Amino acid sequence: MAEQINESHQRFLQVLMSHGIMESSLVRALHRHCCEVHKVNYMHDNLDDFVGVLNKHLQPLFMKIEKGVGEEDGLTYYALVNRVENDITKMASDYAENELELFRKTMELIIISENGFAPPISILNLADELQSKKMKKKEVEQLLQSFVQDKWLIGRNGEYTLHTRCIMELEHYILNTYQDVAKICNVCHKIAIQCQLCENCGIPLHLQCAGIYFRGIANPLCPNCKESWPHEIPDLSQVSSQGPSHSQAAPVRGRNQRSRNISTVARTSR
């Protein structure tokens, strides 16, 4: 029989859900806070067990708290992921049909791009290609801000890429839908959106994976074809010292169906 969840688990889950995704240091602090507030025995190395108890109760709802690595900062993140819906219909409670269609097209632009980014002008032009209700340019601009706020996209230097949360939640959809063009990192074997490509054989490496793999090597060679690696090796110390961006830390808009599911977990576990 699964261990019962208590008020500390419920508070932890509600906060994680309100943020959508949280960096691991914040999750560890949240774990401690929840245990202390509800006077539950706290052990700093017990986070995995704490999350494991929650995941056992989330399993019947086809939801899970998972860990992933941010492509931009290499930090570990925790997110509440819906495992039964393998496409972007999981976003349907927050967006209209034409908005979801625009997101699909935007995601495709990002995935097929060489650097993992889509310029805003290309996304704005998608408004004229929608099969459902057309959108005005101003509406597209406002929608992009909503995608950023809800942590599906990240805006960086005027362009857009997929948020860590989006990659974690839509991993299966991306692999199934874009299996011929989706890039898989040669080192960690995870989806690679922002990456470096070998100019000879075309294999991709996450920026973080490239930094780790080539660390201390004066003349880096492609791990696949052994040709000279043509790119500047990322400085991991500079990236990691930046910490998570504000968009990674801010809460997202509420999700009604997911909120009801969480309430069900809390009630049935008492």
Swiss-Prot record:
Under the heading InterPro entries, the entry gives:
C1-like_sf, Nse1, Nse1_RING_C4HC3-type, WH-like_DNA-bd_sf, Znf_RING/FYVE/PHD
Major enzyme class: transferase
**Name of the protein described by the UniProt record:** Non-structural maintenance of chromosomes element 1 homolog
Q: Where are the zinc fingers (RING-type)?
A: 185-226
User: Where does this one sit in the cell?
Assistant: Nucleus; Chromosome, Telomere
Q: Does the keyword Cell inner membrane apply?
A: no
Q: Which family does it belong to?
A: Belongs to the NSE1 family.
Show the segment(s) annotated as Disordered. Answer: 236-270
Quote any Pfam family the record assigns.
zf-RING-like
Compositional bias (Polar residues): 237-248, 259-270
**Enzyme Commission (EC) number:** 2.3.2.27
Q: What does this protein do?
A: RING-type zinc finger-containing E3 ubiquitin ligase that assembles with melanoma antigen protein (MAGE) to catalyze the direct transfer of ubiquitin from E2 ubiquitin-conjugating enzyme to a specific substrate. Within MAGE-RING ubiquitin ligase complex, MAGE stimulates and specifies ubiquitin ligase activity likely through recruitment and/or stabilization of the E2 ubiquitin-conjugating enzyme at the E3:substrate complex. Involved in maintenance of genome integrity, DNA damage response and DNA repair.
User: What reactions does this protein catalyze?
Assistant: S-ubiquitinyl-[E2 ubiquitin-conjugating enzyme]-L-cysteine + [acceptor protein]-L-lysine = [E2 ubiquitin-conjugating enzyme]-L-cysteine + N(6)-ubiquitinyl-[acceptor protein]-L-lysine
User: What Gene Ontology terms for biological process does this UniProt record contain?
Assistant: DNA damage response; DNA recombination; DNA repair
- Can you provide one Gene Ontology molecular function annotated for this UniProt record? zinc ion binding
Instruction: Please name the CDD domains in this protein's record.
Output: RING-CH-C4HC3_NSE1 (cd16493)
Indicate where this protein is primarily found. nucleus
Domain of life, per UniProt, equals Eukaryota
User: What is one term from the GO cellular component aspect held by the record?
Assistant: nucleus
Please provide the record's keywords in A-Z order.
Chromosome, DNA damage, DNA recombination, DNA repair, Metal-binding, Nucleus, Telomere, Transferase, Ubl conjugation pathway, Zinc, Zinc-finger
**Subunit structure, briefly?**
Component of the SMC5-SMC6 complex.
Keyword Zinc-finger listed: yes
